[in-house]
């Protein structure tokens, strides 16, 4: 009986971890950057999603903020939506990115609007970019948006 390298790795736990993590390719991150709200970042992100869908890519939307814009909402048609996870805070319910649902669904590409968003207290991670990091680590490509004005809030992180 011949043992394969993978069989040996199953026996030795540290190597099993290595096999599982080395064979998973990290997802790519694409960011639509804009100077202010309303300049078309989300609209452009949704346009790219439709182009990818036309090429046969498995694309889902996890968080898309239309801000009441009809043209943007219309572009959501035909894109599978992952429902938000609701977090209760001070008697109110807030929708947040459902990372676990995205990981279970495991699409090729997921849309996550507003990368610099601060999650509701009680969420798994304090910031949405940390949620996105988990999705990327699972090998899923993320397309997101950022307002330049929100980058100033990252000064503390950059200094560290």
PLM-predicted stretches and their roles:
Residues 15-25:
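Pre-Walker A adenine-sensing motif
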Residues 58, 106-109, 138-143:
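Loop/turn-to-beta-strand initiation segments
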Residues 114-129, 153-156:
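Conserved ATPase-coupling elements of RecA-like P-loop NTPase cores
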Residues 39, 51, 65-70, 116-117, ...:
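Conserved nucleotide-binding/hydrolysis micro-motifs of P-loop NTPases
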Residues 127-148:
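Substrate-engagement module of ASCE P-loop NTPases
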Residues 71-76, 153-159:
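Short acidic, glycine/serine/threonine-rich loops at helix termini
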Residues 26-104:
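Conserved P-loop
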């Amino acid at each position: 009986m011949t043992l394969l390298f993978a069989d040996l790795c199953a026996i030795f736990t540290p190597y099993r971890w290595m096999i599982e993590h080395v064979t998973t390719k990290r997802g790519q991150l694409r960011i639509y950057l804009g100077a202010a709200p309303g300049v078309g970042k989300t609209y452009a992100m949704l346009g790219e999603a439709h182009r990818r869908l036309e090429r046969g890519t498995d694309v889902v939307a996890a968080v898309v903020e239309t801000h009441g814009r009809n043209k943007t909402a219309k572009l959501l048609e035909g894109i599978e939506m992952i429902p938000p996870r609701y977090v209760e805070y001070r008697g109110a319910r807030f929708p947040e990115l459902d990372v676990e649902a995205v990981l279970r669904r495991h699409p090729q590409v997921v849309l996550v609007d507003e990368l610099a968003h601060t999650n509701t207290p009680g969420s798994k991670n304090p910031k949405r970019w940390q949620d996105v990091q988990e999705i990327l680590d699972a090998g899923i490509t993320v397309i997101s948006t950022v307002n330049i004005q929100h980058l100033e809030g990252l000064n503390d992180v950059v200094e560290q």
